[in-house]
Amino acid sequence: MKYACLILLWSLFATMALPADNLIQSISIVPCPESITPGTGYFTFSGKTDFTVENEEQAEVARCFSALFTQAAGFTPCVKVGEKKGKISFLTDDALKSEAYHLEITPRQIIVKASDTKGFFYALQTIRQLLPASIEGTAVAETADWSVPAMTIKDEPRFGYRGLMVDVARFFIPKENLLRIIDCMGMLKINTLHLHLVDDNGWRIEIKRYPLLTEIGSRRVDRPGKSFPVVIPGRVNRL
């Protein structure tokens, strides 16, 4: 019994000595924020949740986020412009860099601070990642728990250019898929889409002033010996 008590006490002290990174190892945010300070309890989204924002630009960011709950949860948090009290409050902090944000989540409210709409948008994408995966669904998830853990997050981009290239010149994809890719880019805080529209395989963009670009250039015809040397056993025919 004595040894069991000692082991229990040692375990408790070891847990207290763990750094915050280990205490929040179950929290997955991509990319990893600059700092995360865990809190106590959870904030729960419901039909009574409301946003208070300072202007219409912030309101548009909040409405796009609220729309996720419309399909997945069956309720839509309302957005109020100019109000001072709300469950989720947007506050402009000019001391923060562009795209940076501070996020304070408590069981009673969420305070979002940023210097521009990009920062407010990325803060909500962090909350989006903290919510259950059901938030990405198109049908109401009856049993989902729309809670996020209490914490304080400070984040700013390490790189100004964070890009993804999509090669639509050689690999065709439906428009709906491309729009979904753009949505996922925003969630992962990737800020630049590089559309690879034209390649040697073919010209894909219709320009009415230059119809031959698509009539001829849209297809590539192999012409042996015209672009590369033709290797024949015993000798090499050069261009």
Set out the residue ranges of the language-model regions.
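Contiguous, structured surface segment used for ligand recognition
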Residues: 20-159
